[in-house]
């Protein structure tokens, strides 16, 4: 389910269908803002990766996509187990699943700004930004 404000869409993530819905919407928003197809695809991939992590590790959470004048912002939030070693996750090569996904470190490389706040036992918030060029 998605909530919409004038420049923002919030998606409840509970399953793969929710992840696909958020990804498609994020792609459309990025294209609407004037991002080239390749850049819009990067935003969509990051939404998909973050949504997949919510589904796999937290069970549920939200992804919020916000349009700003010169950038798109993606915020993924959950109240799952948290990430014990954020630096290790950002360095790449760290996984707790057998998936072939891009992962957090790959998502970071696709965006212009990327930050993670996580507390073990309380959850994780990821903020990712792609600037319109």
Positions of the model-derived regions?
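Conserved beta-strand-loop-beta-strand hairpin that lines the nucleotide-binding pocket
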Residues: 1-10, 38, 51-133
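Conserved short strand/loop->alpha-helix "switch" segment adjacent to the catalytic nucleotide/phosphoryl-transfer site
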Residues: 16, 20-48
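HAMP-domain connector/hinge
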Residues: 10-16
